[in-house]
């Protein structure tokens, strides 16, 4: 059986005859107001995909509670197609793998209440060596529309710069072209971009930062770094999760409703993971408001796996309409503490034990941006129990386990000040302020590394709250707060922290210097809630 080889008319698949304005995805958050949830075959099955797998997965998700919990997307990955295009240039599915065809499969998936997604590549070949979309973008968009596809994952293998363009510029051209085509469709596809991943593993991260700057303008989500470990892969699955987790902490400033940072799939049945580690991946991804795309053998998921994957309290966090990504409030050799706001006015705190031993400790409320003069209700989002807290939350965690609490505030104690680490994303070093010096040090969890940033851009440490981060020439120090321009800072989407008086940017190691373009030493992560200038 051959594919549909007669293209549908361009006016039917793309925009109508009326002009359509091409807008950035972040300007149209209604296309994907919350991060996607669903299934993708890649990390579990790679190229071993077929119709039976997707039918059985669809049936299982419809009956085991995953669809009801919100996992409503069924997405194919690489290797679904033939090695050659049809004579008219259109893609053809592999009839051995999909004997009834992708239009039939799409109809089946949708009859069960799911959306249907597909994979292509922006280069001349996919990562598996199948036909890429370069030069065929409009043809492929038309055929995807004809098949009922509503989600496109566009990979970035086999991209080579044309004359006059750098590699980064070539990716921008290809993904920008796809954005224009998809934006003109009567029913635009959700656009998942993989471009940043191809720039994430270099020492000089300027191109990676640059790609991250433009992907929110073109699509609804972007894979920012390396692939998560596949089921048959060698190495530590936990280390792989931690690698992608750490990359995600570097890019929080980009996320907003309509665009989501994607740290890759939930590997829920990987044999190398303990239950605590699986639960941690889910809790961290939910705290990030990251895509929750499961790559596992769904029919064989255990009751324990299904229990955490369908945790409604954590799914509600993931799907919170603010879409604010949790950021680091504190980090040391064992614990990461992350915080964010939720749309109902509550505060989320997520505590990860990434160390090798169990730990029991108190998490002080002031590092969460909350007042220690107030009393709060804290709900454990794993078990559902609620406790009254005043100064701190007492936590006890196994190695590689994660706790998540939702802290309710009342009118008297509703003020939350963005609080947490200011860290250089290239070195991982934390800005550290004492009365004698301000510089960059390894993150150690001390309050001299935990900063509060108010709405006017004034920055102070928790350890010395009467003193503010001050620029004088190219030097920085803590000085008594006076709210002069030397103590006011602005944070840009590029990651630059710029002083209002000098016009210089904070630079790793201490001090300020002339602002460069996406230079490693001047890109910083700041707490969620700080205003980001676009």
Curated annotation (Swiss-Prot):
- Disulfide cross-links: 47-79, 127-157, 430-443, 468-481
Q: Which catalytic residues are annotated?
A: 155 (nucleophile), 213 (proton donor)
Which UniProt keywords are listed?
Answer: Disulfide bond, Glycoprotein, Glycosidase, Hydrolase, Lectin, Secreted, Signal
Indicate where this protein is primarily found: secreted
Signal peptide: which range, if any? 1-25
Keyword field contains Signal: yes
The protein's name in its UniProt record: Probable alpha-galactosidase A
Q: Which organism is it from?
A: Aspergillus oryzae (strain ATCC 42149 / RIB 40)
């Amino acid at each position: 059986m051959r594919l549909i080889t007669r293209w549908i008319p361009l006016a039917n698949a793309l925009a109508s005859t009326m002009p359509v304005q091409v807008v950035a995805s972040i300007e149209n958050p209604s296309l994907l107001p919350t991060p996607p949830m669903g299934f993708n075959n890649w990390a579990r099955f790679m190229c071993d995909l077929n119709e039976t797998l997707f039918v059985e997965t669809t049936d299982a998700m419809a009956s085991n509670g995953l669809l009801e919990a919100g996992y409503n997307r069924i997405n194919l990955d690489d290797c679904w197609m033939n090695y050659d295009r049809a004579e008219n240039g259109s893609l053809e599915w592999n009839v051995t793998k999909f004997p009834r065809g992708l239009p039939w499969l799409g109809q089946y998936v949708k009859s069960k209440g799911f959306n249907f997604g597909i994979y292509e590549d922006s280069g001349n070949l996919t990562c598996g060596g199948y036909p890429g979309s370069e030069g065929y973008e409009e043809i492929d968009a038309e055929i995807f529309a004809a098949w009922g596809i509503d989600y496109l994952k566009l990979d970035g293998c086999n991209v080579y710069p044309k004359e006059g363009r750098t590699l980064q510029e070539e990716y921008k051209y290809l993904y920008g072209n796809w954005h224009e085509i998809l934006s003109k469709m009567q029913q635009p596809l959700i656009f998942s971009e993989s471009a940043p991943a191809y720039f994430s593993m270099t020492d000089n991260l300027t191109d990676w930062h640059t790609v991250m700057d433009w992907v929110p303008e073109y699509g609804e989500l972007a894979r920012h770094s390396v692939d998560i470990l596949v089921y048959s892969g060698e190495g530590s699955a936990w280390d792989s999760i931690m690698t992608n987790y750490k990359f995600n902490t570097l890019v929080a400033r980009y996320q907003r409703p309509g665009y989501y940072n994607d740290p890759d799939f939930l590997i829920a049945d990987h044999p190398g993971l303990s239950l605590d580690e699986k639960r941690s991946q889910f809790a961290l991804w939910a705290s990030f408001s990251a895509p929750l795309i499961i790559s596992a053998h769904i029919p064989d998921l255990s009751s324990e796996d299904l229990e955490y994957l369908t945790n409604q309290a954590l799914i509600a966090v993931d799907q919170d309409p603010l879409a604010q990504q949790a950021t680091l409030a504190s980090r040391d050799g064992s614990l990461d503490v992350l915080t964010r706001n939720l749309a109902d006015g509550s505060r989320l705190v997520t505590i990860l034990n990434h160390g090798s031993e169990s730990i029991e400790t108190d998490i002080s409320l002031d590092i969460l941006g909350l007042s220690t003069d107030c009393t709060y209700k804290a709900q454990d989002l794993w078990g559902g129990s609620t406790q009254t807290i005043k100064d701190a939350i007492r936590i006890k965690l196994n190695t590689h386990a994660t706790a998540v609490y939702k802290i309710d505030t009342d009118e008297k104690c509703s003020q939350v000040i963005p609080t947490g680490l200011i860290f250089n994303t290239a070195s991982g070093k934390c800005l550290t302020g004492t009365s004698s010096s301000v510089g960059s040090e390894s993150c150690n969890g001390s309050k001299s590394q935990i900063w509060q940033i108010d709405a006017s851009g004034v920055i102070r440490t928790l350890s010395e709250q009467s003193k503010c981060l001050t620029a004088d020439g190219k030097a920085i120090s803590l000085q008594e707060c006076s709210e002069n321009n030397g103590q006011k800072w602005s944070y840009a989407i590029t990651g630059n922290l710029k002083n209002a008086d000098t016009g210089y940017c904070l630079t790793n190691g201490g001090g300020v210097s002339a602002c460069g373009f996406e230079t490693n030493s001047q890109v910083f992560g700041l707490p969620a809630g700080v205003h980001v200038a676009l």
